[in-house]
């Protein structure tokens, strides 16, 4: 996951999947979002200031950051998530960056000392540059990437992954009126402008060979789980990927992102047998992946979790 709602929630679920208690996908157990007072993820209220009421882990200063990262590593997370920029829907503009460079440096330093991945919510220009300069591998959003940020990413493109979360932006702008987020409201928030900027940023990153991943911010009412394949359609229709490029973003790049580059992401000898069988050709129509009725089989590590139908009768076939 990108981040979790409680300190050990992802760890407990990951462990239950890995020991066979429950069925689930491979994923990196994440920390809560690490944020600052008043930042994205600080959901405490004046009358309920206790940390237990916050969605994120709230820190202020380098030493609080160090202690926070060490505690998450003690709990057994695989990755740390830090909110480097704002989020307009919470009242802090997406272009705003709230952490100091020292706080970011300590976060990455401690995470790397424990061998953990670091991911960042980074919409603002400054936050994108900090991800590259400080060594944060997984960059969520990267909407407002200027030329300097693009140059930095291109020069370090084998060290970073960008997950723009386009479906969240698109649905927030155009398909969330039921939840009070009308196009008029989201335009005032700045999301329509950000969507335009994000599409242009992703087009530029694709031209420069920067690895772009699907996923991110699914689980909202207007971006429900199980609709993740919509990202691949947007990659093709909006940022110019070929269907093959979009498929590679969802398969081949997942391995190195999860530090399992030699084990997953490909169907070949030596890799784990994680296979999706589709009734259709996504190279001809990438949207076929969104039709759940056409998912014939789901296999993880050689075990079917949805087995393909087996014909009990069929026409005779003769071999010469």
Give the positions of each predicted feature:
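Short beta-strand/loop segments at the ligand-binding rim of alpha/beta enzyme cores
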Residues: 107-119
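Divalent-metal coordination cores built from histidine and acidic residues
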Residues: 1-110, 151-185
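Glycine-enriched alpha-helix->loop->beta-strand junction motifs that scaffold or abut catalytic
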Residues: 132-138, 156-161, 180-186, 207-211
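C-terminal cap of metal-dependent C-N hydrolases
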Residues: 250-252, 269-316
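Histidine/acidic-residue-rich catalytic or RNA/ligand-binding cores of hydrolases
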Residues: 10, 39-40, 90-92, 128-134, ...
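Structural recognition of alpha->loop->beta junctions
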Residues: 129-149, 234-245
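His/Asp/Glu-enriched, well-ordered alpha-helical/loop segment
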Residues: 113, 178, 183-186, 194-281
């Amino acid at each position: 996951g990108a981040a979790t709602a409680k300190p050990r929630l992802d760890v407990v679920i990951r462990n239950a999947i890995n020991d066979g208690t429950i069925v689930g996908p491979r994923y990196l157990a994440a920390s809560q979002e690490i944020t600052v007072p008043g930042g994205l993820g600080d959901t405490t209220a004046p009358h309920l200031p206790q940390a237990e009421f916050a969605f994120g882990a709230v820190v202020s200063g380098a030493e609080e950051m160090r202690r926070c990262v060490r505690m998450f590593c003690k709990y057994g997370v695989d990755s740390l998530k830090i909110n480097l920029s704002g989020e307009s829907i919470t009242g802090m503009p997406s272009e705003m960056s709230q952490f100091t460079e020292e706080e970011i440096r300590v976060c990455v330093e401690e995470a790397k000392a424990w061998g953990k991945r670091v991911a960042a919510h980074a919409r603002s220009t400054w936050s994108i540059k900090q991800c590259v300069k400080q060594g944060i591998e997984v960059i969520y959003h990267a909407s407002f990437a200027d030329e300097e940020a693009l140059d930095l990413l291109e020069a370090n493109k084998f060290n970073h992954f960008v997950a723009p979360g386009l479906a969240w932006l698109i649905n927030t702008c155009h398909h969330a009126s039921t939840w009070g987020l009308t196009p008029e409201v989201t335009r005032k928030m700045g999301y329509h402008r950000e969507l335009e900027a994000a599409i242009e940023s992703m087009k530029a990153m694709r031209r420069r060979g920067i690895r772009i991943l699907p996923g991110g911010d699914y689980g909202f009412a207007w971006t429900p789980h199980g609709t993740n394949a919509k990202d691949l359609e947007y990659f093709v229709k909006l940022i110019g990927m070929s269907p093959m490029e979009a498929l590679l973003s969802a398969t081949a790049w997942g391995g190195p992102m999860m530090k399992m580059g030699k084990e997953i992401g490909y169907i070949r000898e030596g890799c784990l047998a994680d296979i999706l069988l589709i009734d259709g050709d996504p190279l001809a129509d990438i949207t076929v992946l969104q039709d759940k009725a056409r998912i014939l089989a789901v296999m993880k590590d050689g075990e079917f979790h949805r087995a393909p139908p087996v014909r009990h009768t069929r026409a005779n076939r003769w071999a010469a």
